[in-house]
């Protein structure tokens, strides 16, 4: 999706870490908090299925974070984490969301921008 925008002559969206924090913590859009613990989110409201995201910005480069969001199965073939950009492979999707990726190109940049701040 981002590559298509760049090839079409569009500029890559610039991420906003504040918007990214809202998406990551949302239980209705990004959904990250359903599986991951996050700094500032009470344990009772955070998941434990995926790794804790505290310090993720120190553990991975921006490119590594992007790769993990776009193709998580490359790093763990048994992962339950969905791709943030693909439209296939989802089950039990709300009818209005069936043909949409989990995150738009702008939302992906926002989430990456936020994750990079988690040092």
Task: Give the residues covered by each predicted segment.
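C-terminal capping alpha-helices of c-type cytochrome domains
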Residues: 86-119
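Sequence context surrounding c-type heme c attachment/ligation sites in exported
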Residues: 18-21, 25-33, 46-47, 101-105
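The canonical Cys-X-X-Cys-His
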Residues: 20, 28-39, 65, 111, ...
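Bacterial N-terminal signal peptides
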Residues: 1-8
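Gly/Gly-Pro-rich "capping" loops immediately C-terminal to redox-active cysteine motifs
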Residues: 25, 37-71, 80-94
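Electrostatic cytochrome c docking/interface patches
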Residues: 8-27, 40-42, 119
């Amino acid at each position: 999706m981002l590559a298509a925008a760049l090839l079409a002559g569009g500029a890559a969206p610039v991420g906003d870490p504040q918007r990214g924090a809202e998406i990551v913590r949302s239980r209705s859009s990004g959904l990250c908090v359903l599986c991951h613990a996050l700094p500032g989110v009470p344990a009772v409201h955070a998941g434990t299925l995926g790794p804790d995201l505290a310090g993720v910005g120190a553990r991975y480069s921006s490119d590594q974070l992007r790769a993990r969001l776009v193709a998580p199965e490359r790093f763990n073939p048994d992962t339950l984490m969905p791709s943030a950009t693909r439209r296939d492979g989802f089950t039990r999707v709300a009818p209005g969301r069936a043909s949409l990726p989990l995150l738009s190109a702008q939302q992906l940049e926002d989430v990456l921008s936020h994750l990079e701040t988690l040092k």
